[in-house]
Amino acid sequence: MSTDILRKIEAYKREEIAAAKAERTVADLKARAQDQEAPRGFFKALEAKRAAGEFALIAEIKKASPSKGLIRPDFDPPALAKAYEAGGAACLSVLTDTPSFQGAPEFLTAARNACSLPALRKDFLFDTYQVHEARSWGADCILIILASVDDDLAKALEETAFELGMDALIEVHDEAEMERALKLSSRLLGVNNRNLRTFEVDLAVSERLSKMAPADRVLVGESGIFTHEDCLRLKKSGIGTFLIGESLMRQADVAAATRELLTGKA
């Protein structure tokens, strides 16, 4: 996503946030969060898979994207969540952004309620209000994209997530962002293999940035991971956790495709 696209997204997100704040206060969101099941432990679920010697998959529920258009016409979040769980995924990632991804908050709630996996709110966050929103919808983790926020906002988003018992996935796509991410507390670092200016995807980004991460950080490979061989390639750089959406979303049998991606066996 180019800087221009990120700017456009920020503009409509800030409008969305202002409209949401006019409708519901943070106190309202906190009350709604009380009705939700407690956070399921997103980071913990990933660690459990890795401790068992398995790849840990954050499986994405995504209807469409700005670059690819409609990805899955028969879009059924609860059924997809169950298929991912049956296929061995550790966690879910659910798009809640409507203008660019045809996502929705109710997709997150419905997907999470259909299975026992923890769920990430996949969205562009520019205000701690959105973290409270995420928890009120049932999210167990938030995404902080360092290409779109400064250090102070990143820290505020992370602290709010931790206060609510959630985890935070910090997304980076170059060396400068990795250095910034290492100053935050979260041990969960997503490396986006997509160049935000050219849209080109290259797994070498993960291989390169993995050298900067201390052993206590868990690296998540994002974008450009389509096969079990891709997973094995990144494993050589110490990456055994992946966020994968589009390649699985396009499959007729999502559970079988998930299993094959993780194990190499049909």
Curated annotation (Swiss-Prot):
Q: Does the keyword Membrane apply?
A: no
Q: Which InterPro entries match?
A: Aldolase_TIM, Indole-3-glycerol_P_synth, Indole-3-glycerol_P_synth_dom, Indole-3-GlycerolPSynthase_CS, RibuloseP-bd_barrel
GO terms for biological process?
L-tryptophan biosynthetic process
Tell me which EC number(s) this protein carries: 4.1.1.48
**Pathway(s):** Amino-acid biosynthesis; L-tryptophan biosynthesis; L-tryptophan from chorismate: step 4/5
Source taxon at top rank? Bacteria
Reaction equation(s) it catalyzes:
1-(2-carboxyphenylamino)-1-deoxy-D-ribulose 5-phosphate + H(+) = (1S,2R)-1-C-(indol-3-yl)glycerol 3-phosphate + CO2 + H2O
Keywords of this entry = Amino-acid biosynthesis, Aromatic amino acid biosynthesis, Decarboxylase, Lyase, Tryptophan biosynthesis
Q: Name one Pfam family in it.
A: IGPS
GO molecular-function annotation terms?
A: indole-3-glycerol-phosphate synthase activity; phosphoribosylanthranilate isomerase activity
* Family, as annotated: Belongs to the TrpC family.
Note the HAMAP family from the entry: IGPS_B (MF_00134_B)
Name under which the protein is recorded: Indole-3-glycerol phosphate synthase
Name of encoding gene: trpC
